[in-house]
């Protein structure tokens, strides 16, 4: 009986500790993606060869 009690305590601890982490929202993911793409295009725009191929982004 004590073993069953310990098993229940262990399972509830694992379930609650893994559910505490809040996943990033779509809004946060979209902002991060936009920042990464802006940084990538800034690097591209400083490179003459890349800028020539992707002028519509610069």
UniProtKB/Swiss-Prot annotation:
MF-aspect GO terms: acetylcholine receptor inhibitor activity; ion channel regulator activity; toxin activity
Pfam families: Toxin_8
Signal peptide (UniProt feature, chain positions): 1-17
Residues covered by region (Lacks the Ser-Xaa-Pro motif that is crucial for potent interaction with nAChR): 46-48
Tissue and organ expression note: Expressed by the venom duct.
Disulfide topology: 44-50, 45-58
Location in the cell: Secreted
Pro-peptide positions on chain: 18-35
Domain of life: Eukaryota
Residues passing through the membrane, by range: none
Family annotation (InterPro entries): Conotoxin_a-typ (IPR009958)
A GO term from the CC aspect: host cell postsynaptic membrane
Keyword annotations: Acetylcholine receptor inhibiting toxin, Disulfide bond, Ion channel impairing toxin, Neurotoxin, Postsynaptic neurotoxin, Secreted, Signal, Toxin
Family: Belongs to the conotoxin A superfamily.
Role, per record: Alpha-conotoxins act on postsynaptic membranes, they bind to the nicotinic acetylcholine receptors (nAChR) and thus inhibit them. Has possibly a distinct nAChR binding mode from other alpha-conotoxins, due to a different three residue motif (lacks the Ser-Xaa-Pro motif).
Record text about domains: The cysteine framework is I (CC-C-C). Alpha4/7 pattern.
Protein name (database record): Alpha-conotoxin-like Pu1.6
Classification lineage: Eukaryota, Metazoa, Spiralia, Lophotrochozoa, Mollusca
């Amino acid at each position: 009986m004590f073993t069953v009690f310990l098993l229940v305590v262990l399972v509830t601890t694992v379930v609650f500790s893994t559910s505490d982490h809040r996943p990033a929202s779509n809004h946060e993911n979209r902002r991060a993606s936009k920042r990464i793409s802006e940084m990538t295009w800034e690097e591209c725009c400083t490179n003459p060869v890349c800028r020539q191929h992707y002028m519509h982004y610069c």
